[in-house]
Amino acid sequence: MSGSRSTLPAADLARVVVFAAFIAVLGLFPGFGGVAGVPIVLQNVGPILAGAILGWKLGTASVALLLALTAIGLPLLSGGRGGLAPFVGPSAGFLIGWLLSALVTGLIVQRARTRTLPVLLVACLAGLLADYLIGMPVLGLVVGDLWSGFVQSLVFVPGDLIKVVLAAVIATLVHRALPDLLPTPAREPRVR
């Protein structure tokens, strides 16, 4: 009996689960400082790495799995946070932004003809900006002033830029070691 239901191959499912677990492990490193109840954490590099290594579809799926498990109560976020509270507090926009972060990073990496450090730096930076695109305005709404939310979010930028470089280096090494991990777009012939 064949249906129209598509299935995820076992290897892809394993990659999604392992990366969701990896992002959860990054949450074991305690957050510190931050602004308006949003801590500075290592965990936000996980979605960027997921997109950079697994591509947009599997990377986004791994983040969605982590967020779903968190929402049902597992304490998978930095500081042992879980349940619905993180999704309605000051971190909410950044958490939801993780989905967009993995998606944007993964799309750029998958569409790139090469997976060199400069390409991966651009992809990872774009993923970070995608997270900020959602996180900063939501933080602004929580603190009661969009501009204030933007300014307060600037405290995250230096550390996040270091994490972006680290993610790009790791992803470059992974793609160098496993060049067929993601399909590469076909090169179009040059017209002379």
Feature map (PLM): residue ranges:
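Glycine-rich, small/polar surface segments that engage phosphate groups of diverse ligands
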Residues: I53-P75
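Short helix-perturbing small/polar motifs within transmembrane alpha-helices
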Residues: V16, V25, L84-D131
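Structural signal for the C-terminal ends of transmembrane alpha-helices
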Residues: I53-K57, V104-A112, L173-L178
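Alpha-helical transmembrane segments of multipass membrane proteins
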Residues: I23, G27, S62, T70, ...
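Interfacial aromatic-anchored transmembrane helix boundaries in multi-pass membrane proteins
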Residues: G27-P39, L67-S101
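Hydrophobic alpha-helical transmembrane segments
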Residues: L13-V18, V45-L49, G59-L65, S91-I96, ...
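Membrane-embedded alpha-helical hairpins and interfacial helices in multi-pass inner-membrane proteins
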Residues: A36, G80, A112-R192
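Hydrophobic transmembrane alpha-helices
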Residues: M1-T60
